């Protein structure tokens, strides 16, 4: 008769797949000739005590994604208080708003948190400016994460001088190498499964392993398709020092997502998402993984034929930008990339709902972030014990 440990190991091997080559990487993500402790069968010892938990003083190797319009103080503080690292999604927040949000988070937790910035130009102008960096330094933020493009070396140096660590979300090995050359402290390897704005064309685990090999000894986290404890275990066994979790965190009580958005996530199945450039008068021509709604199906392959919005076009809804600070009313144009929040009204069938391809199929409920994190970590711990 098989023992519970044997069954757990068999379950994990099934999840890994025969071709995953998981034993090629150790717990540190180093090549197999540099692996640290291993068991009597030659398997690397992997646990939830990772470089991320040790260097950043957190209980869990868990980071909530800095999702624009969704990852506001309630979610960030909930994750930080649960022993992970909560990330504020700054998106298009202006510097005064960023400052207020950071202070709100600081008043709600003594845990670890950071700020995610988009380094790119939007229809509103540059999403991130020197003033945003100044705010982070003045507020003594301990972690800043950049998305889309690698920031200037001057920003990284300024943040480092202010005692802040800097990460880069990377969609490719080349971008990871560029970021490391610029001086970042860690890479979030974003696989193509990840929801939202995402330029990656490589699945999460293969990308993770390639990035680890390319940028060693820089710390690397896994992103894309992570919604369960088994996903966490798989990422750690392939060398990740932590996980970056987005879609699962949208389906939390603290996420600032409209109830209709959360409902649609729970009801998604099959080929639930698609990558499109249809959405985004506010941020045009950027690949965006969203739920595959009827609208997304209709425009698939014809995104280039969508005309720019005109003043006479009927809007698809109304919402509020900077909802926790400045509260600016906003009329949503057709194909708006602004995510539906509790302040949003209008035609939801015409809106975009960012979602990860694999994660969305694993969602079963909306619960407090702390419960989800504890469950994922407990399940991952059980699987890793079975593996070891």
Description of each model-found segment:
Residues 26-46:
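C-terminal segment of N-terminal export signals and the immediately downstream linker at the start
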Residues 39-219:
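Active-site entrance/lid segments in N-terminal catalytic domains of soluble metabolic enzymes
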């Amino acid at each position: 008769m098989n023992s519970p440990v044997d069954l757990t190991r068999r379950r994990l091997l099934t999840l890994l797949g025969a071709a995953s080559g998981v034993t090629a990487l150790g717990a540190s993500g180093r090549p197999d000739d540099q692996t640290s402790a291993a068991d009597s069968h030659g398997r690397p010892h992997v646990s939830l005590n990772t470089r991320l938990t040790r260097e950043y003083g957190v209980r869990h190797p868990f980071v909530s994604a800095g999702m624009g319009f969704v990852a506001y103080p309630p979610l960030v503080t909930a994750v930080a208080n649960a022993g992970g690292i909560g990330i504020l999604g700054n998106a298009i927040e202006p510097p005064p708003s960023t400052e207020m949000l950071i202070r709100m988070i600081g008043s709600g937790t003594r845990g670890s948190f950071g700020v995610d910035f988009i380094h790119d130009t939007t229809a509103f102008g540059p999403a991130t400016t020197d003033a945003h960096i100044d705010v982070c330094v003045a507020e003594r933020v301990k972690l800043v994460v950049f998305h889309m493009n690698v920031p200037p070396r001057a920003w990284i140096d300024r943040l480092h001088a202010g005692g802040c660590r800097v990460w880069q979300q990377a969609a490719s090995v080349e971008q990871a190498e560029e970021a490391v050359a610029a001086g970042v402290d860690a890479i979030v390897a974003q696989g193509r499964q990840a929801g939202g704005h995402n330029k990656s064309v490589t699945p999460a685990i293969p990308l993770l392993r390639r990035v680890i090999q390319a940028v060693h000894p820089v710390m690397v986290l896994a992103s894309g398709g992570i919604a369960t404890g088994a996903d966490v275990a798989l990422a750690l066994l392939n060398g990740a020092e932590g996980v970056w979790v987005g879609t699962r965190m949208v389906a939390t009580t603290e996420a600032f997502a409209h109830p209709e958005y959360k409902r649609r996530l729970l009801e998604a199945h099959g080929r639930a998402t698609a990558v499109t450039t249809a959405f985004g008068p506010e941020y045009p021509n950027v690949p965006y993984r969203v739920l595959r709604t009827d609208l997304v199906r209709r425009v698939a392959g014809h995104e280039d034929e969508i005309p720019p919005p005109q003043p006479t076009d009927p809007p698809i809804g109304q919402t509020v930008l900077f909802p926790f600070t400045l509260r600016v009313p906003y009329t949503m144009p057709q194909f708006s990339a602004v995510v539906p929040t509790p302040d949003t009204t209008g035609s939801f069938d015409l809106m975009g709902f960012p979602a990860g391809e694999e994660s969305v199929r694993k969602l079963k409920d909306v619960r407090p972030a702390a419960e989800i994190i504890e469950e994922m970590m407990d399940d991952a711990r059980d699987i890793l014990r079975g593996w070891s």
